[in-house]
Amino acid sequence: MKILLDFLPIVLFFGSYKLYGIYVATAVLMAATALQMALIYAIDRRLQTMHKVTLALILSFGALTLALQDDRFIKWKPTVLYGAMSVALALTLWALKKNFLKLLLGSQLALPDMVWLRLNWAWIAYCAFMSAINAYVVLHWSTDAWVDFKLWGYVFPLVFLIGQGLYIAPHLKNQGRT
């Protein structure tokens, strides 16, 4: 059920874009994301920080897109989101000497510190890559191509998360043997 909720806004955005254009699609994305968050809250009785940030950015950038009739705002939202995540992970690691991923997931996954550090670096690199690739697509491709990229670009996080799982798995198996 939750996986369907994750895809709801992007599928509705894509469909409405193909039928009605970027401004209707932006309004649909805003409404679908708000509905998605309401449903997640109804199921979990809480929203994670990432959900709140995503909703705030979609509503903010979407409102600017609609009010100013300028699609650049909604197209830059992923660049800002991923860039901010990359910077936040790096600053937490360097300035605060804390591993944000370990703080977030350490109670659920017992992993060696070196594994947490590598995961953190992988997330920093992944978020920086996603920010950069979205910026490239926004700057060099048409809005039609950007929308297609947004839909098919959902493969990137799936591949990344599968890779993370494959990296973590041997370390979890080793825990049971000690």
From Swiss-Prot:
The chain crosses the membrane at residues 10-30, 47-67, 76-96, 121-141, 151-171. It is found in: Cell inner membrane. One of its GO terms (cellular component) is plasma membrane. Keywords: Cell inner membrane, Cell membrane, Membrane, Transmembrane, Transmembrane helix. It is a multi-pass membrane protein. Its main location: membrane. Pfam families: IspA. The keyword Transmembrane applies. Coiled coil: none annotated. It comes from the Bacteria. Belongs to the YciB family. Plays a role in cell envelope biogenesis, maintenance of cell envelope integrity and membrane homeostasis. This is Inner membrane-spanning protein YciB.
